């Protein structure tokens, strides 16, 4: 029997970043079916879009995304993601992610299809691998996180099964 405050299943960017945030509030057990770097994040190339420098604005980024989405995007979700992106980029940097920089120390931003401004942060053409590397390093160092590699989540017994109050985060 194993008890934990937070159970994270999967070791991609979402699982690892959640584990790091949750570890500030309790013990985290992270379960992954293979090695931690065996995930889709590790293979992502391109980069991450974020309003970083003027003349870019949240409004321009939201507009570009909605235009490219051709009516298939939820405008509220687009606005939330665009406005939170700089904060989440700061988290990735704090956890050790190294994005490419220009000789003067500014982030080297790319511009790709559908974007009217340079707003794509990247690490060479291996952005996902760099993010995964930094997150894994931070997770392995954190005293409140236990990692179980080569494990499967099959039968989970929660407080709900015991007839007690359970919350979802």
Annotate each predicted stretch with a short phrase.
Residues 2-4:
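Core beta-strand elements of the Rossmann-like FAD/NAD(P) dinucleotide-binding domain
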Residues 6-30:
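N-terminal Rossmann-like FAD-binding beta1-loop-alpha1 element of flavoenzymes
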Residues 32-169:
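Conserved N-terminal/central alpha/beta ligand/cofactor-binding core
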């Amino acid at each position: 029997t194993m008890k934990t405050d937070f159970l994270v299943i999967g070791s991609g960017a979402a699982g690892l970043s959640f584990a790091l945030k949750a570890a500030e509030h309790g013990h985290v057990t992270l379960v992954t079916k293979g090695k931690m770097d065996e995930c889709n994040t590790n293979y992502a190339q391109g980069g991450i879009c974020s309003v970083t420098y003027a003349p870019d604005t949240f409004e321009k980024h939201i507009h570009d995304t909605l235009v490219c989405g051709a009516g298939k995007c939820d405008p509220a979700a687009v606005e939330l993601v665009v406005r939170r992106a700089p904060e989440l980029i700061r988290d990735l940097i704090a956890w050790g992610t190294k994005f490419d920089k220009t000789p003067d120390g500014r982030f080297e931003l790319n511009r790709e299809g559908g974007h009217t401004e340079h707003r794509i942060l990247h690490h060479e053409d291996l952005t996902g691998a760099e993010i995964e590397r930094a997150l894994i390093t931070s997770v392995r160092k954190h005293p409140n996180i236990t990692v179980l590699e080569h494990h499967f989540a099959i039968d989970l017994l929660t407080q709900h099964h015991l007839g007690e109050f359970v919350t979802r985060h």
